[in-house]
Design a protein with these regions (language model features):
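Short, flexible, solvent-exposed loop/turn segments with mixed acidic/basic and small polar residues
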Residues: 1, 58-63, 97-98, 193-195
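Sec-dependent N-terminal signal peptides
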Residues: 1-9
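Glutamine-centric residue-chemistry signal
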Residues: 10-11, 24, 280
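N-terminal secretion/transport leader regions
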Residues: 19-21, 26-39
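Acidic/histidine-rich, surface-exposed loop or edge segments in extracytoplasmic proteins
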Residues: 28-32, 60-75
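Compositionally biased P/S/T/G-rich terminal and signal peptide-adjacent segments
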Residues: 40-64
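Long, folded non-catalytic interaction modules
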Residues: 71-86, 91, 95-302
């Protein structure tokens, strides 16, 4: 992949596509007798959520609240646009709005032939962009150093922002501020809180040397998945059908799967004002089971 600059934030978003669904290559096969064994679908969904999710310590999962602005740098324009189109398609399927041309990118995707050196320079130049507060917004200093020194083909860093669930006002003190923000409390409740966690921005760095031989379509699906959710960079989904296995040769898939789509849809439909983070993850797992069941019952697409 040639390293010429293409600013994806300046390019027009594609027209709204149909909702994103996992692609299916083969028609279903009729099986007369099926014996179900192993863990229940509910257990599998809870395990999937537990493995892939990586919110800041003690926090509920964050998601984009209304809109995203996608930028791609250091790729030829045609490759950059393909990534923008795919990430936009996934965002639109989650009822997000795509920023207009010229918007400030909050999903920044950068390709580099010296990924670690480039990442370290970014963090050194703008440390508060990666850790804007002492806690609650990111995975912490140890995780940031792992991000800087990662050997992964694709690395990412999410920054979330706790905000008042009713007003959207920031609910955390940032570096350099002396007084904490005042957060209005809705009322005494053990189930519902007064804040939600919104994604503020994500930086995704692609090592061009390590993604050679991978089609831009498959890579775009992988990038879209990590752009839309706080995915654990150390996630191990061996034996699970997921685009997150792209760099796991034994379990590699070529597109976003039913499990991936179900997770994103469940995340974006879950209540964000849960007072207890585990209540949110339980809701996501329950919704995933419904989504995966619906996907398995859908008719196979025509070739």
């Amino acid at each position: 992949l040639a390293l010429t600059v293409a600013d994806g934030a300046q390019q027009s978003p594609p027209p709204p596509p149909p909702a994103v669904v996992a692609r299916q290559d083969d028609a279903p096969v009729q099986i007369e007798d099926v014996v179900v064994s192993g863990r229940s679908m509910q257990d599998q969904a809870r395990t999937f959520v537990g493995k892939v999710s990586a919110p800041p310590p003690g926090m509920a999962l964050a998601r984009w609240h209304r809109s995203v602005c996608i930028g791609v740098a250091n790729l030829q324009p045609e490759y950059a646009q393909q990534i923008i189109d795919r990430v936009s398609a996934v965002a639109l399927s989650l009822d997000l709005v795509i920023g207009q041309p010229g918007c400030k990118a909050n999903v920044m995707i950068v390709a580099s032939d010296q990924a670690s050196a480039f990442t370290q320079r970014m963090v050194s130049d703008e440390p508060f962009n990666f850790r804007p507060a002492r806690s609650m917004t990111d995975l912490g200093g140890t995780a940031l150093r792992a991000f800087e020194n990662s050997t992964a083909p694709v690395r990412w860093w999410h920054v979330a922002m706790p905000v008042n669930v009713d007003t959207g006002d920031r609910a955390v003190r940032l570096h350099g501020e002396t007084d904490p923000p005042v957060v209005a409390v809705r009322g005494a409740s053990l189930l519902v809180g007064s804040t939600r966690n919104d994604l503020s921005h994500v930086v995704i760095v692609v090592d061009v040397h390590q993604v050679r031989g991978i089609s831009i379509d498959v890579l775009s699906d992988y990038i879209a998945m990590v752009a839309m959710a706080q995915i654990d960079p150390e996630v191990d989904l061996s034996g699970q059908s997921s685009i997150l296995n792209l760099f796991n040769n034994s379990d590699r898939v070529s597109h976003m799967t039913d499990w991936d789509v179900a997770y994103l849809r469940a995340l974006y439909s879950a209540r964000q004002d849960r007072a207890v983070a585990t209540h949110q993850t339980r809701e996501i797992a329950n919704t995933m089971v419904e989504g995966i069941g619906a996907a398995s019952e859908a008719p196979a697409p025509h070739p």
